[in-house]
Curated annotation (Swiss-Prot):
Heterodimer of a large and a small subunit. Interacts with RRM2B. Interacts with AHCYL1 which inhibits its activity. This is Ribonucleoside-diphosphate reductase large subunit. It comes from Pongo abelii. The modification N6-acetyllysine is found at residues 17, 376. It catalyses: a 2'-deoxyribonucleoside 5'-diphosphate + [thioredoxin]-disulfide + H2O = a ribonucleoside 5'-diphosphate + [thioredoxin]-dithiol. Provides the precursors necessary for DNA synthesis. Catalyzes the biosynthesis of deoxyribonucleotides from the corresponding ribonucleotides. ATP binds at residues 5-6, 11-17, 53, 57. The active site is at residues 427, 429, 431.
Length: 792
């Protein structure tokens, strides 16, 4: 059997040669556990004559990855094999790689199709010695196997299907793409990115330094007008943004309801559903640049709209196709008045915005006055019990995990953009809360701080370093506003006037574990607050420094910050004594700030996978999960737990099987000591009341909002109602992003006879269940405290 080498020569397969290649990459690993010969044995079994050395390395890396559950060092080895494989394939020198990317000729049409911008290449070539020598290729070896594979699959630029960039090249391309001729700043950013202190968002990593640097993640729109022109102009904007791979939030509360009169045609409106089906098909058609994921639109509606019940059915799995729009995402923009009426079991009036205009343009007391005046004038189209609509909301969430829940009055009352007008919606991921109008499409550029990195070897938390890195991130995101490619002019106008940015986090759960704090402990709750105080403080200080150089953002005057009111003031919260807020407020009073909004913990799915961190602000969902690779799928264990169990001599095949049998929980495994059981509780074992409380405590330092998922293993209407009311009363802006549930571990098997139940019996069962659910919902509203105690 022979292999084909990289230069095309053939060579006989030699067991020892494969083993020695693997052995070379085992430096610093625990050789009591890691066995290169065992990997070689498995690799040989998968070989065929004529295999290339590239394929051989890929197989060796996958094989090492599958052995990760034996010892965590196998994961490091797997990544080293994969990275060294790429290093042999891709050129080393950064400036050479950038020239190759610029000189790319498209094989389909023979035309010059540069993959990086001429301006980027010129800067690289003019500073090539400094940039080339600043790169430290060993840092490529710090990715874990799955982080590296994610980069290779989606982030590193390819020439004719072959990866051309090394991870360090990509990070330097991004740094130069953002900072242009400011080489000192580019190298500072490169070092922080490559040492994993923070990461820019995926669109920034994909597109920085290219011909079309669309670096923003989020776009928010409100309907231009309740007319055919307005609806289709907005649709075109959505299509153009989606083509550039932006996630979209759209406010549709101003669109007239079903049956409303249309003066221009003397006809009647078909309402929201047919319009949203058109938006649904656009989302499917415009799939973020031709070969990526489908377009993603979140549709925001206020619950007084007459079409609200149909809106709640749009994502359901059953029902008539023409009444569904399953590719869209749905969110409620909820005024406090609705929550109050649900709580006190009052009536709720449904209206058409054409007959009752302006409800989406006001909030708080003004909204309540206008709404009550329309009720008095009898302009109402339908009256229902507020709890009947609440039941439909809970029913939809239990079935589909959505609609998202955002509280309109909190979003406006606690916004630094409230001087611009009423905010009408959030983003696709519920963390961006920005003003939109017919002339302005709100935009946000994102980055996330890797919170695990600031835990020192002495188990203390380095707040000073966190503040320093936050300041660099602010400067970067502020620069992106000016160099960004905007898919529509309204986005450019909005972003340059208000200059909002969104700094989020990843690895909060990892930071708690490294500090040895269980997620629900008092220590974790204090650290949670202090982390977000630090990020908010650092961000405000950096934005103030920028304002000192460049002046405050255009619409600063009249904003809460311009009056000395910061986010925590709007929550009536006093910060801890970690930072000198008095000094900062004096500085801001003198110079202002450059950015209207700063903090927005977003979901960090892809970038957290790259850096090997747990997502965002979330607890771990499981201590074991499955990963798929070409050669099959295998289990990965929470690396912190694996390390702890290995150190205590508790890690063996039987333990792995027990964790798998317990669906990733360790609570019922007798050999595991209590301190580890506390530390490694999964989200299903953590009180969601604590999760909501911690969200509110950090919320006082979050001037946008946060993507907050609620996890209830087996939701019932009572538990869910309790959760929502607790979150609302805590003052959250986003009460819920997704409702995450767990499929029953042993689904009940229906026998044929049971399926043949008479329809009558089935109907009575459904009615019984509805009564039970309603009772649970009402019970939780009437006995809030007791119900929360019995809820998760």
């Amino acid at each position: 059997m022979h292999v084909i080498k990289r230069d095309g020569r053939q060579e006989r397969v030699m067991f020892d040669k494969i083993t020695s290649r693997i052995q070379k990459l085992c430096y610093g690993l625990n050789m009591d556990f890691v066995d290169p010969a065992q990997i070689t044995m498995k690799v040989i079994q998968g070989l065929y004559s004529g295999v290339t050395t590239v394929e051989l390395d890929t197989l060796a890396a996958e094989t090492a990855a599958t052995l990760t559950t034996k010892h965590p060092d196998y994961a490091i080895l797997a990544a080293r094999i994969a990275v060294s494989n790429l290093h042999k394939e891709a050129k080393k020198v950064f400036s050479d790689v950038m020239e190759d990317l610029y000189n790319y000729i498209n094989p389909h049409n023979g035309k010059h199709s540069p993959m990086v911008a001429k301006s980027t290449l010129d800067i690289v070539l003019a500073n090539k010695d400094r940039l080339n020598s600043a790169i430290i290729y060993d840092r490529d070896f710090s990715y874990n196997y799955f982080g590296f594979k994610t980069l290779e699959r989606s982030y590193l630029l390819k020439i004719n299907g072959k990866v051309a960039e090394r991870p360090q090249h990509m990070l330097m391309r991004v740094s130069v793409g953002i900072h242009k001729e400011d080489i000192d700043a580019a190298i500072e950013t490169y070092n922080l990115l490559s040492e994993r202190w923070f990461t820019h968002a995926s669109p920034t990593l994909f597109n920085a330094g290219t011909n079309r640097p669309q670096l923003s993640s989020c776009f928010l729109l409100s309907m231009k007008d309740d007319s055919i022109e307005g609806i289709y102009d907005t649709l075109k904007q959505c299509a153009l943004i989606s083509k550039s791979a932006g996630g979209i939030g759209v406010a549709v509360s101003c669109i007239r309801a079903t049956g409303s009169y249309i003066a221009g045609t003397n006809g009647n409106s078909n309402g929201l559903v047919p319009m949203l089906r058109v938006y649904n098909n656009t989302a499917r058609y415009v799939d973020q640049g031709g070969n990526k994921r489908p377009g993603a639109f979140a549709i925001y509606l206020e619950p007084w709209h007459l079409d609200i019940f149909e809106f709640l059915d749009l994502k359901k799995n059953t029902g008539k196709e023409e009444q569904r729009a399953r590719d869209l995402f749905f969110a409620l923009w909820i005024p406090d008045l609705f929550m109050k009426r649900v709580e006190t079991n009052q009536d709720w009036s449904l209206m058409c915005p054409n007959e009752c205009p302006g409800l989406d343009e006001v909030w708080g007391e003004e909204f309540e006055k206008l709404y009550a005046s329309y009720e008095k004038q009898g302009r109402v189209r339908k009256v229902v019990k507020a709890q009947q609509l609440w039941y439909a909301i809970i029913e939809s969430q239990t079935e589909t995990g959505t609609p998202y829940m955002l509280y309109k009055d909190s979003c406006n009352r606690k916004s630094n953009q409230q001087n611009l007008g009423t905010i009408k919606c959030s983003s696709l991921c519920t963390e961006i809360v920005e003003y939109t109008s017919k002339d302005e499409v709100a935009v946000c550029n994102l980055a996330s701080l890797a919170l695990n990195m600031y835990v020192t070897s002495e188990h203390t938390y380095d707040f000073k370093k966190l503040a320093e890195v936050t300041k660099v991130v602010v400067r970067n995101l502020n620069k992106i506003i000016d160099i960004n490619y905007y898919p529509v002019p309204e986005a450019c106008l909005s972003n340059k006037r208000h200059r909002p940015i969104g700094i989020g986090v990843q690895g909060l759960a990892d930071a708690f574990i490294l500090m040895r704090y269980p997620f629900e402990s008092a220590e974790a709750q204090l650290l949670n607050k202090q982390i977000f105080e630090t990020i908010y403080y650092g961000a405000l200080e950096a934005s103030c420094d920028l304002a000192k150089e460049q002046g405050p953002y255009e619409t600063y005057e009249g904003s809460p910050v311009s009056k000395g009111i910061l986010q925590y003031d709007m929550w009536n919260v006093t910060p801890t004594d970690l930072w000198d807020w008095k000094l900062l407020k004096e500085k801001i009073a003198k110079y202002g700030i450059r950015n209207s909004l700063l903090i927005a913990p977003m979901p960090t799915a892809s970038t957290a996978q790259i850096l090997g961190n747990n997502e965002s602000i979330e607890p771990y969902t499981s201590n074991i999960y499955t990963r798929r690779v070409l050669s099959g799928e295998f289990q990965i264990v929470n690396p912190h737990l694996l390390k702890d169990l290995t150190e205590r001599g508790l890690w063996h095949e039987e333990m792995k099987n027990q964790i798998i049998a317990c669906n990733g929980s360790i609570q019922s495994i007798p050999e595991i000591p209590d301190d580890l059981k506390q530390l490694y509780k999964t989200v299903w074992e953590i009180s969601q009341k604590t999760v909501l409380k911690m969200a509110a405590e950090r919320g006082a330092f979050i001037d946008q909002s946060q993507s907050l998922n609620i996890h209830i293993a087996e939701p019932n209407y009572g538990k869910l109602t309790s959760m929502h009311f607790y979150g609302w009363k805590q003052g959250l802006k986003t009460g819920m992003y997704y409702l995450r549930t767990r499929p029953a571990a042993n689904p009940i098997q229906f026998t044929l006879n049971k399926e043949k139940l008479k329809d009558k019996e089935k109907v009575s069962k459904e009615e019984e269940e509805k009564e039970r659910n309603t009772a649970a919902m009402v019970c939780s509203l009437e006995n809030r405290d007791e119900c929360l105690m019995c809820g998760s």
